[in-house]
């Protein structure tokens, strides 16, 4: 509210999605940036759990009736997203490498692949076109299972210079196992 209320008071009411880039500090969270879009990869772990039709949610946002929508999420499952990046990202990386294995996601309910830095080349083939190439997402009964499935799914995809972090979700798993 501290962001949108002043916008409304200035005669510029906001309709849409605001993503806040935050940093946790010893003095509490601090806002680093605002974006009028979904966060990436944050949306990749939230949207698979959304039970509402996203088009209905968007229309309610546009119509100003979002407060009348009962947003429902699958809170019985966990979701993990692993970003497949081009080696060298965020500094320097090459583009244009063919991406193989995307078809392996077809028909698999707990697995998703979100495109970010991709494009079709002149032959109609999907190739790398950015530093953050794909978001490989999986759901599971808990964080440990979702993480295992997401990392397994990263092996379905290949492209030259593929890079990923191997520690996604580990700190939360360690915390949950120690409590």
Model-derived features: where do they sit?
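Short amphipathic alpha-helices in soluble, non-transmembrane regions
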Residues: 96, 147-153
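Residue-level detector of conserved catalytic or cofactor/ligand-binding positions
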Residues: 171-179
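Active-site "cap" helix and flanking loop/linker of ATP-utilizing ligase/carboxylase catalytic domains
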Residues: 1-18, 35-110, 121
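Short, well-ordered beta-strand elements within core beta-sheets of diverse protein domains
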Residues: 81-83, 132-140
